């Protein structure tokens, strides 16, 4: 398994024969790649946590270019269908549900404490034969993260730390205690001034109270398991 960060909340998770592109706002100011370059990498699926501009991003254009199915809440898949994605190219689901993508890869949709233009915000647990990844989406800290950690043996947690619109470093460090992942990658910070944070502060907080290893990635970096 490998996980590539494009800045903000955009990642490509590669496991088995699949390439899962998550929240592809790859035109963000930190991204090392253009939407065209990301499409050329041929993602097999596009997962969207909610429909705010910085998460929906270029998902429609990339889906049109690649034919990759779009995974999201029912309301979100209706929204991308209105933008020209065929209904047959969408995979609607809802919080608490699981879908199988093939090659032993399953996606479980988690709740997120946030807002959305349509439908509910969410996160994803991606369980694969090579490891399990939790992408929290945009969220505040919530106690049921402990249940997510009990349900899934999380190898990597991708957590927002920007504050203002999501939890900040202090709350995200508590989230790590609840989730009990082996590794943590901070996201959704320093893309613009309102969410400026020091990821090293988050790293110090987490590693002082848990056994999790924090990886402070730079946009374009790849984490291999």
UniProtKB/Swiss-Prot annotation:
This is UPF0173 metal-dependent hydrolase Pcal_1074. Keywords: Hydrolase. Coiled coil: none annotated. It comes from Pyrobaculum calidifontis (strain DSM 21063 / JCM 11548 / VA1). InterPro entries: Metallo-B-lactamas (IPR001279), RibonucZ/Hydroxyglut_hydro (IPR036866), UPF0173 (IPR022877), UPF0173_UPF0282_UlaG_hydrolase (IPR050114). Belongs to the UPF0173 family. The keyword Hydrolase applies. One of its GO terms (molecular function) is hydrolase activity. PANTHER family: UPF0173 METAL-DEPENDENT HYDROLASE MJ1163, UPF0173 METAL-DEPENDENT HYDROLASE MJ1163-RELATED. It holds the Pfam family Lactamase_B_2.
């Amino acid at each position: 398994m490998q996980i590539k960060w494009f800045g903000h909340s955009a990642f490509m998770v590669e496991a088995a024969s699949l390439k899962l592109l998550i929240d592809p706002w790859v035109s963000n100011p930190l991204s090392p790649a253009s939407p065209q370059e990301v499409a050329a990498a041929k993602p097999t699926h596009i997962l969207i946590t909610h429909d705010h501009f910085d998460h929906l991003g270029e998902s429609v254009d990339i889906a049109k270019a690649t034919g990759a199915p779009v995974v999201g809440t029912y309301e979100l898949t209706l929204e991308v269908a209105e933008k020209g994605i065929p209904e047959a190219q969408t995979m609607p689901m809802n919080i608490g549900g699981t879908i199988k993508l093939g090659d032993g890869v399953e996606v479980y949709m988690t709740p997120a404490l946030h807002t959305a233009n349509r439908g509910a915000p969410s996160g994803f647990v991606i369980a694969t034969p090579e490891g399990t990844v939790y992408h929290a989406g945009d969220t505040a800290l919530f106690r049921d993260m402990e249940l997510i950690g009990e349900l899934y043996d999380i190898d990597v947690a991708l957590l927002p730390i920007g504050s203002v619109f999501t939890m900040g470093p202090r709350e995200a460090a508590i989230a790590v205690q609840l989730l009990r992942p082996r590794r943590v990658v901070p996201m959704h910070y320093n893309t613009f001034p309102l969410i400026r944070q020091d990821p090293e502060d988050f790293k110090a907080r987490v590693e002082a109270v848990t056994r999790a290893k924090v990886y402070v990635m730079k946009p374009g970096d790849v984490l291999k398991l």
